[in-house]
Amino acid sequence: MLAVGPRHRYLNIEEKQNMWLQVVRYYMAILILFGVPVGLLMWLVIHPFHKLLRHAGLVWAYLFVAIPLILLAGTILWFRDVLLATDYGANYLLMALSVAPFALAVAIYLSHRKYLTLPIQVGVPELTGGQKGVLLTEGIYGHIRHPRYVESVLWILGYAFFTNYLALYLAFLLTLPVIHIIVLLEEKELKERFGHDYEEYCRRVPRYIPKITWRSQKAA
């Protein structure tokens, strides 16, 4: 745990800047280590068990989902200093490199935020089988099927570069296969909800990386 006490008043300007940079890096790393596994686990619970959870009702479904999330969050917070024991230190080159994934993540977020309402982001359509919802195929969803997950990966990569903790590099690597598993589960559920329309959409639009056609290159 990083500590900032009265002693910092005797440090020179450069030392104070380094100290506060350490604090920022540490708490940014905590944010990712806490948020990413909890978010991924939520979908790993919702998607495989969505039919069972629907029968329980929305309130009970969220209570069921919350139990493993709370346990995981508590475990991460308890072992946070062990998880962050390997610190490679502030690296200004990597911090500069983090701008690229951060910028791409922001661009993707701005392009999909109007389509993803809060109920969609917390899994309400999956947990309420009677509400089919709307299949998103316009805007960025006309180029990639899962912009939200691509955005998440870019955020994690940016934070890994900026904080330069081993745990965040490992989190980035582990997130890739886990997100792909979540995507496969999500697509199975979407096929159940939208049938042929979603299958046709999958044939037209790639999952993660947009198609670059000769026409789009010429237009650019």
Question: Where do the PLM segments sit?
Answer:
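Membrane-anchoring alpha-helices and their flanking helix-loop junctions
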Residues: 3, 10-137, 155-220
